[in-house]
């Protein structure tokens, strides 16, 4: 099911509009280039609609949010929905302030996302009957997602994997989006299927913005094959994890987390479908 996904990205060179945060913007641009896509990082409200209209994917990341950027995200998202361009949401630190909570509620109420990545603060509790309407109340009760790396995937273990698969599957059904959570065990789900992915290395937690890079990478993969979003997201998550593993193998005694970050991007650049097939640990739940 994952044949030629990486080849497709290199052949189609999707243009990805990233409205992301300044901490990781350079790495996000570079990882899109490394995988075979092309990034554009425009965020002014006077041009975002036009920029989105010429792109094949839109990546929205709320890591460094403000009113102007939020307005641009809403406008770009509306254009993408109108034109059938897949939209990725990375709600970084969504539960860390009332402002972010309301911003995510606004985005989810007005933009149809193809993929939602990193959902701790949006859906930390089961029993939400309407995600968009219920975001605020849910987040008010669970403000533990304070950092970039927080996520419910921290709680996914072999003992509860079936339960978590059911939970994430229900979130996909409620939002209409493919849901991706990353941690010790990664999970990706659409309305009918759930996959667990067991790639990655613990040193990735020392790279600020690794999750932001994954969202940008995911946007490129999905844009290259938007008819198979679930498969594209699974591949992106696995590729990022494999790249973390391969990067760690390159580490010399004098190397630190900055070298490791660069090695991850190098691994994405050199990734092939054969490498994904050989090293990807993707299983259906």
Language-model regions, residue ranges each:
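Charged C-terminal helix
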Residues: 242-285
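Glycine/small-residue-rich loop that forms an oxyanion/phosphate-binding "nest" at active or ligand-binding sites
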Residues: 69-118
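Conserved N-terminal subdomain of the carbohydrate kinase-like
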Residues: 2-89
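Short, small-residue-enriched loops and turns at beta-alpha junctions
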Residues: 65-68, 93-97, 187, 204
């Amino acid at each position: 099911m994952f044949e030629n996904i990486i080849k497709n990205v290199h052949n189609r060179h999707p243009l990805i509009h990233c409205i992301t945060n300044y901490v990781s913007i350079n790495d996000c641009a570079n990882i899109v280039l490394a995988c075979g896509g092309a990034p554009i990082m425009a965020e002014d409200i006077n041009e975002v609609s036009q920029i989105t209209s010429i792109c094949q994917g839109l990546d929205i990341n709320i890591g460094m949010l403000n009113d102007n950027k939020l307005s641009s995200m809403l406008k770009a998202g509306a254009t993408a929905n109108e034109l059938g361009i897949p939209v990725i949401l990375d709600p970084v630190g969504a539960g860390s302030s009332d402002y972010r909570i309301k911003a995510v509620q606004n985005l989810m109420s007005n933009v149809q996302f193809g993929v939602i990545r990193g959902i701790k603060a949006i859906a930390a509790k089961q029993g939400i009957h309407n995600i968009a309407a219920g975001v605020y109340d849910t987040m008010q009760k669970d403000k533990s997602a304070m950092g970039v790396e927080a996520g419910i995937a921290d709680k996914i273990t072999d003992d509860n994997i079936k339960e978590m698969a059911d939970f994430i599957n229900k979130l996909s059904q409620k939002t209409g989006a493919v849901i991706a959570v990353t941690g010790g065990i990664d999970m990706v789900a659409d309305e009918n299927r759930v996959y667990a992915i067991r790639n990655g290395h613990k040193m990735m937690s020392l790279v600020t913005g690794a999750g932001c890079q994954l969202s940008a990478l995911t946007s490129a993969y999905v844009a290259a094959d938007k008819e198979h979003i679930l498969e594209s997201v699974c591949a992106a998550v696995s590729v990022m994890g494999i790249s973390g593993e391969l990067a760690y193998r390159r580490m010399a005694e004098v190397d630190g987390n900055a070298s490791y970050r660069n090695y991850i991007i190098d691994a994405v650049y050199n990734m092939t479908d054969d490498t994904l097939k050989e090293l990807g640990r993707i299983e259906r739940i």
